[in-house]
Amino acid sequence: MKQVAFVFTQAPHGTSAGREGLDALLAMSALTEEIGVFFLSDGVFQILPGQHPQAVLSRDYISTFKVLPLYDIERCYICRESLQERGLSEEHAFVIDVEALDAAALRERLDDYDVVLTF
């Protein structure tokens, strides 16, 4: 079975990319167990708790990331440099457990995947 990587690069509100990526991720989990999830650039905001999307008339889908372990999706990575550029750190609380890696290590991990989908 092919290994599939989901890369979140967009902020959670303002576009539907994050929600669509999460929907695709959950759907793909029925087809393969070889899934990796990567958060880089503004995508690091996808898994920050305490957001209030209703204030900008958006749907709150962020808490749905919490179900990933129930779907056996446990390989989740976040870009250390992206966090630092946005004033965050790897010690910050996120809605899921993620492993912080530098950009070079993230590229190496992504090279292991047959298919890379970016949202």
Curated annotation (Swiss-Prot):
UniProt xrefs under InterPro entries: DsrEFH-like (IPR027396), Sulphur_relay_DsrE/F-like (IPR003787), Sulphur_relay_TusC (IPR037450), Sulphur_relay_TusC/DsrF (IPR017462)
Gene3D superfamilies per record: DsrEFH-like
Entry's Gene Ontology cellular component terms: cytoplasm
Location(s), subcellular: Cytoplasm
Task performed by this protein: Part of a sulfur-relay system required for 2-thiolation of 5-methylaminomethyl-2-thiouridine (mnm(5)s(2)U) at tRNA wobble positions.
Subunit structure: Heterohexamer, formed by a dimer of trimers. The hexameric TusBCD complex contains 2 copies each of TusB, TusC and TusD. The TusBCD complex interacts with TusE.
Name this protein carries in UniProt: Protein TusC
Organism: Cronobacter sakazakii (strain ATCC BAA-894) (Enterobacter sakazakii)
Lineage, highest ranks first: Bacteria, Pseudomonadati, Pseudomonadota, Gammaproteobacteria, Enterobacterales
Gene that produces this protein: tusC
